[in-house]
Amino acid sequence: MNQKPPPYGYGGAGGGGVGPSSTSNTTIIGTLSARAKQTTQSMITTLRPWREILDLSALSLPRGYDEAMAHLKHNISYFRGNYALAVLAIVFLGLIYHPMSMIAFIVVFIGWILLYFSRDANDSIVISGKEVDDKIVLVLLSLVTVLALVYTDVGENVLVSLIIGLLIVGAHGAFRNTDDLFLDEESARRGGLVSAGSGNRPPSSYTPI
């Protein structure tokens, strides 16, 4: 009499079969690890030498509002990695007397990086074979962030630290002279300093004599 084969993912006593859930978990962990490595490498490549930020001789008073905004836009594109680390450092300093809150903040921050900011348009999250919409991911991450701030009772500390960090970044960006800061074409386009089609502009034609 023929026996029915065991269900998929369940081996015999010596089969050592691996269930689909185990394979799925391994795939998710591998994807997150690769994404974390790629994000870290990308952030490192955007960092500029800190001596360029701390160069006091490069600070000057802008001649007007338009020049200050031009400086700010250029410096944010150039120092974006350094500015992000500076703001995070200020937030961490605001939580230095709240170690549990700092741990919660780090976990939430890593979640935002891995599950939202480091993903491109074609990189979707799949759970149990179903694709999760980006709006759901955004809502869930926002909810977790709010709950973390409420239950750790440091929402005011984080808000004040963020405001201080953004004010420092804004002041530095507006007063830092940009004459010695040269952006590559991709960074300039991302910062809105050049039009999207300027890099693909064909060379001007000429008539040989």
Swiss-Prot record:
Swiss-Prot/TrEMBL GO biological process terms: vesicle-mediated transport
Q: Which domain of life is it from?
A: Eukaryota
Localization (cell): Endosome membrane
What does UniProt note about where in the body, tissue by tissue, this protein is expressed? Expressed in hypocotyls, roots, lateral roots, columella cells, leaves and shoot apex.
Q: Where is the composition biased (Gly residues)?
A: 9-19
The coiled-coil regions, if any, are none
Q: Which Pfam family would be a valid example here?
A: PRA1
Query: Record's InterPro entries?
Result: Prenylated_rab_accept_PRA1
Q: Which GO terms describe its cellular component?
A: endoplasmic reticulum; endosome membrane; Golgi apparatus
Question: What keywords appear on the UniProt entry?
Answer: Endosome, Membrane, Transmembrane, Transmembrane helix, Transport
Parts of the chain that traverse the membrane: 90-110, 132-152, 155-175
Region Disordered, as annotated, extends over 1-20
Topology class, membrane: Multi-pass membrane protein
Q: Which PANTHER family match?
A: PRA1 FAMILY PROTEIN E, PRENYLATED RAB ACCEPTOR 1-RELATED
Q: What do we know about how this protein assembles, alone or with others?
A: Interacts with PRA1B1, PRA1B2, PRA1B3, PRA1B4, PRA1B5 and PRA1B6.
Similarity annotation: Belongs to the PRA1 family.
Task: Name the job this protein performs.
Answer: May be involved in both secretory and endocytic intracellular trafficking in the endosomal/prevacuolar compartments.
Name the UniProt record assigns to this protein: PRA1 family protein E
Q: Which organism is it from?
A: Arabidopsis thaliana (Mouse-ear cress)
Designated gene of the protein: PRA1E
